[in-house]
Amino acid sequence: MDDEKIISQGIMQKHLRDLLKDPPNLLKNFHYEDVLAFLELGEQIHFFKGDTILSDDEYVNAAYLIAEGKVSVWKENIQLATLDKKEFLGETFLFSRNNRTERIACEEDCILLKYERYEALNYFRKRPEKLFNIFTKNIIEIQQNKISSMNSQLFALMK
């Protein structure tokens, strides 16, 4: 499907165009067509400020891309992180089923793209193996950055 056809159908919304121009880190080094196909795979879900997206210890088989807005991650009453546009929640969802989550809440009105595990796996099965290897490498880099950030925060707390 080309851009003109998508735009003429009214499917290509501003947040999707923005994500195509500057893809999230999880899709880094994907070709334009692969980024577009992956974005189209996601189910758009709208949330409002204060909404709970996922509850504590909920089991999920999906990941969420923040297309617009900002969310916070909570464990009990402690805010663990704030995530912005272009960040993923649960990016390791392809590697295990029924992942448990922390509470995810909207800090402002949001549009999330929800990716079901089964559909995402089928997406990669239909493409060259190299694309899944790039995706896996991106996940590892994201996880390394999260660990480094947590280490820095822990170190700051211990001072």
Which positions does each model-derived feature cover?
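Cytosolic regulatory regions built on CNB/CRP/Popeye-like sensor folds
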Residues: 1-159
